[in-house]
């Protein structure tokens, strides 16, 4: 498991044991309650005897370093985004999942789930991460290359037909193609039978590599009109775009992000976040973030442009297929005061299970 570790040596060298302890307490209090922590309450939490005045002096130094700030006059202190990043990199202890938590995840997205359909696993993973993290669970899956099981040509008009492609897992894709003039229903059936006999069990990319070879076979076995139909169908299928790009985003637990929002401005920022998530470019961006390093990645607030307006954090990890290709990502989106140390192992273990189930 690898976390993002920017160079914070300058900040680290400026903190002694006492200031580090005070900083850690401020951040942990924020992650737990979301409220500023004042010097008087903080002095009571410290394992060493320190007056509120001495605590305030240390707080002032931490403010100068850009690690904490005061939301308003005479308030306590909250961590800045820089402070949160420094805490995650320098102070956070990533916890271990309990046996009960591992078993719960396995029941929903592992071998313990009796419904192993891709759709069910993706939905269950997103729902499970949402429930355990109190954030929004997300799963991104890349567009797969379905293996062709069956093809049928259905006439829609004298010059148009619907080509129905059925994959090995019974997924269905429909394409409208232009028919050669004068082709009969019998020839439609003949063309479909040819495709099913010669191309079943192959993916579209595999079809691309042997398109010319298939055309030669067509010319040897079919009449001219049926040949024309098969070649038109092959041209449409092999010209499909977008293979390997993120095709789907599943998000569960959006309502969790509404908790603690204050005013229409916060709600509008959240709306913009979910609008952005629905855009294909955003899916590619999230997948790229997951691919940018091994293991779990943490992005806080404006560290990523996708979350700069909403002030959200993302914890994300990729999962892989049997060829070790990244085929998707799982993660949690939430406020910057997410329980990072608890969520990181959840995301990490879920990604491991998704990789096993994708092999």
From Swiss-Prot:
Signal peptide: none annotated. Pfam families: HrcA (PF01628). Gene3D superfamilies: 3.30.450.40, Heat-inducible transcription repressor hrca homolog, domain 3 (3.30.390.60), Winged helix-like DNA-binding domain superfamily/Winged helix DNA-binding domain (1.10.10.10). One of its GO terms (biological process) is negative regulation of DNA-templated transcription. HAMAP family: HrcA (MF_00081). Belongs to the HrcA family. Negative regulator of class I heat shock genes (grpE-dnaK-dnaJ and groELS operons). Prevents heat-shock induction of these operons. NCBIfam families: hrcA. This is Heat-inducible transcription repressor HrcA. It comes from Sinorhizobium medicae (strain WSM419).
């Amino acid at each position: 498991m690898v976390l993002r570790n920017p160079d914070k040596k300058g900040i680290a060298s400026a903190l002694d044991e006492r200031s580090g302890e005070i900083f850690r307490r401020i951040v942990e209090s924020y992650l737990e309650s979301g409220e500023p922590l004042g010097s008087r309450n903080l002095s009571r939490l410290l394992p060493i005897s320190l007056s509120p005045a001495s605590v305030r002096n240390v707080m002032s130094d931490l403010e100068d370093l850009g690690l904490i700030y005061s939301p308003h006059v005479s308030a306590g202190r909250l961590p800045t985004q820089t402070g949160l990043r420094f805490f995650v990199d320098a102070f956070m202890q990533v916890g271990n999942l309990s046996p009960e938590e591992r078993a719960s995840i396995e029941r929903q997205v592992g071998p313990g789930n009796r419904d192993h359909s891709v759709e069910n696993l993706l939905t269950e993973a997103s729902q499970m991460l949402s429930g355990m993290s109190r954030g929004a669970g997300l799963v991104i899956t890349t567009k797969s290359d379905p293996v062709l099981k069956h093809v049928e040509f259905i006439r829609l008009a004298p010059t148009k037909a619907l080509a129905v492609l059925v994959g090995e897992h019974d997924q269905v894709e429909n394409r409208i193609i232009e028919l050669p003039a004068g082709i009969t229903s019998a020839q439609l059936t003949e063309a479909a039978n040819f495709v099913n006999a010669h191309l079943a069990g192959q993916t579209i990319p595999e079809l691309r590599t042997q398109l010319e070879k298939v055309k030669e076979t067509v010319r040897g076995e079919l009449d001219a009109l049926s040949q024309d139909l098969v070649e038109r169908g092959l041209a449409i299928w092999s010209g499909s775009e977008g293979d390997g790009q993120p095709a789907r985003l599943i998000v569960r637990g959006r309502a969790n992000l509404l908790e603690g929002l204050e005013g229409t401005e916060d709600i509008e920022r959240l709306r913009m976040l979910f609008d952005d998530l629905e855009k294909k470019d955003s899916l590619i961006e999230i997948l790229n973030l997951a691919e940018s390093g091994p293991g779990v990645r943490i992005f806080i607030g404006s560290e990523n442009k996708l979350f700069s307006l909403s002030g959200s954090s993302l914890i994300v990890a990729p999962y892989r297929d049997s060829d070790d290709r990244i085929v998707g990502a799982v993660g949690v989106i939430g406020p910057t005061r997410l329980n990072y140390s608890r969520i990181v192992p959840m995301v990490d273990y879920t990604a491991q299970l998704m990789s096993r189930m994708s092999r």
